[in-house]
A protein has these predicted regions:
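C-terminal catalytic/acceptor-binding lobe
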Residues: 20-23, 167, 189-268
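Short beta-strand-to-loop acidic/aromatic patch adjacent to the donor-nucleotide binding site
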Residues: 96-106
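Active-site-proximal specificity loops/subdomain of glycosyltransferases
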Residues: 50-92
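Active-site acidic short loop of glycosyltransferases
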Residues: 93-96, 185
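Conserved catalytic core of nucleotide-sugar-dependent glycosyltransferases
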Residues: 108-188
């Protein structure tokens, strides 16, 4: 077990397809089997598929306890407000490091440990644990592929079922929790699928925080996409308009903008 005990992985989920269910099981298993850490999963949906479909499988396949804090919010809304859900988990976490973690992402163990140490001991505020550019393995998973991977965590299994693609700013970020909060957390004015990944990186760099990056690959387990995870999101135009507006701000205007966001009052 790798010691990441002063970190909390925050994972927002809505299990809207069988491949997303498989990904949640795969990534949760990977984290629990390899790291001594803390995990919060917040699920927003009509019913909890994590409890009914994922948890029984995890209990069956894991050699360790399912040490996950699962929070379920019942909702019939078609909107999965990922940004709000993340903020609620940032607020819930009580460790010095918070990891915004996409349920479809797998990172090499060495990258996870290095990102953690860069914040804990290296003076970084934010770390992107993968490179910029062609550092993404887009994995086309099947039940057999992920089962083989979970047997011994051999990344070659994922590589052999993938294509290399662009990586920039999404999936996983390690944050000093105090900095995440000080810098405005997730922008809840973005709704569902949005340029929030670009904005987050842009913002924390513009505000002068020490943002680091690790030149290694990330594995993204592909999945079906609905309106909450693709450009068909009905809020896409307003999301893009907000992103354009933020890019026109000076550092001082950006600080002023985030100091006046009403959603932040919930977390004080």
């Amino acid at each position: 077990m790798i010691d990441l005990s002063n970190a909390t992985f925050i994972i927002p989920i809505r299990i809207e397809s069988d491949d997303r269910l498989r990904n949640v099981i795969t990534t949760t298993s990977y984290l629990l089997e390899n790291f001594d850490t803390n995990i919060i999963i917040k699920e927003v949906d009509k019913t909890s598929r994590f409890v009914s479909d994922a948890l029984p499988v995890l209990k069956n396949i894991l050699s360790v306890p399912v040490k996950v804090k699962h929070i379920f919010e019942e909702s019939n809304s078609p909107l999965f407000h990922r940004q709000r859900v993340l903020n609620e988990m940032i607020h819930e976490a009580d460790t010095d490091i918070v990891v915004n973690y996409d349920c479809d992402a797998i990172l090499p163990i060495d990258s996870m440990k290095k990102a953690y140490d860069m914040i804990k001991d290296g003076g970084y505020d934010v770390v992107y644990p993968y490179g910029w550019g062609n550092y993404q393995y887009q994995v086309k998973p099947s039940d057999d592929v992920v089962s083989d991977f979970l047997e011994n965590y051999d990344y070659a299994i994922l590589k052999s079922n993938s294509t290399i693609y662009d990586a920039q700013s999404g999936w996983v970020q390690f944050f000093k929790r105090s900095v995440y909060i000080e810098g405005g957390m997730e922008n809840e004015n973005f709704k569902a699928y949005a340029p929030e990944d670009k904005e987050r990186l842009y913002r924390y760099q513009k505000l002068g925080y020490n943002v680091g990056r690790i030149s290694n690959f990330i594995y993204h387990l592909e999945h079906a996409r609905g309106q909450n995870s693709w450009f068909t999101n009905p809020h896409m135009q307003s999301n893009n308009d907000l992103w354009e507006e933020i890019q026109r701000m000076t550092k001082e205007q950006l600080i002023e903008y985030y100091s006046n966001q009403s959603y932040l009052q919930k977390y004080l």
